[in-house]
């Protein structure tokens, strides 16, 4: 189920130019990744705050917690840094997250640029440590 479902989502994203989450909704919202992650983490006994933060990193609500803000920002920045399913996957920073963090779009662009300058070195260092 999951491999075929995942491929259907990627195909839909590519055809429609939408996000992974939007593709999940458009294809019936069966087993969306927020719900699946929440269920897996509940079984892992990682704590309620982390379960809820991961389970709401796209549906952040009006007053997201600090952890939700961190996860949401990291998720969107990872797309900006080239770690998305598709090269042109839309980036959707939640206004509530940016507001709570006191960030403007230009701040996010600056953060992305600083991260992209150092990221290759960080990845190389990590790979040296784990190998």
Summary of predicted features, one role per range:
Residues 1-131:
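Metal-dependent nucleotide-binding catalytic modules
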């Amino acid at each position: 189920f999951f491999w075929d479902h995942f491929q259907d989502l990627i195909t839909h994203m590519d055809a429609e130019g939408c996000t992974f989450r939007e593709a999940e909704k458009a294809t019936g919202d069966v087993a969306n990744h927020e719900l699946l992650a929440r269920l897996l983490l509940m079984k892992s006994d990682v704590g309620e705050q982390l379960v809820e933060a991961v389970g709401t990193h796209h549906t952040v609500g009006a007053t997201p917690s600090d952890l939700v803000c961190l996860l949401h920002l990291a998720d969107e920045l990872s797309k900006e840094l080239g770690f998305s399913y598709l090269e042109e996957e839309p980036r959707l920073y939640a206004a509530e997250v940016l507001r709570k963090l006191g960030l403007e779009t230009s701040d996010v662009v600056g953060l992305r640029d600083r991260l992209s300058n150092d990221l290759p070195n960080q990845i190389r260092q990590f790979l040296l440590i784990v190998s």
